[in-house]
Amino acid sequence: IGRTVASLMRQNYAGPIHVIVVDDGSDDGTAAAAGDWPNLRIVPGSLLPGGWTGKLWAVNQGLTQVNVYLPDAEYILMTDGDIVHGPDNIAQLVNKAESEQRHLVSLMVKLRAQSFWEKLLIPAFVFFFQKLYPFPWVNDPASPTAAAAGGCMLIRRETLQRVGGVEHIRDQ
């Protein structure tokens, strides 16, 4: 998480960047590892209620914090805690959203594969994801099907509010 937060705080982006980390009670020292940055808020996660998956429950708690502490944020970046972002990542995502008038943009980040099983399964996951949701197809505004890589998604706040947040997909 420390490398993720650092990569977000060091973005070449003209706008303000605020990071909210939900510490879901893991024993990996999330709060300490996240570091001490201006505009970083670490919030303790609450127990996982029935009907929610862990990741979406953490996202929902983070979004609650955004609504309280960043009510004027135009965009919200939802990202996994093990992704190291390139220095222009946020600027590129915002530029794509604005230039193409998209409500949500995502990117398939390079996933770290260190163990034998990660090296075996991660490429297969990406291959099958691309087969199920061909990138040109799901990126076509005229297509009835859309997909996003859940590890890095930038969404317009108004769009997220209009669809009711993540609660309606909480068990997926």
Q: Language-model segments: what does each one mean?
A:
Residues 25, 82-85, 111-112, 154:
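A short, conserved beta-strand element in the Rossmann-like catalytic core
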Residues 18:
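Cell-envelope/extracellular polymer assembly enzymes that use nucleotide-activated donors
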Residues 29, 79-96:
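Acidic donor-binding/catalytic loop of UDP-sugar-dependent glycosyltransferases
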Residues 146, 165-172:
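Donor nucleotide-sugar recognition loop
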Residues 44-69, 74, 93-163:
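Long helical/loop segments within the catalytic core of UDP-sugar-dependent glycosyltransferases
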Residues 1-10:
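Short, well-formed alpha-helical segments that are part of the catalytic scaffolds
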Residues 7, 14, 23-32, 46-48:
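A conserved acidic beta->alpha catalytic loop
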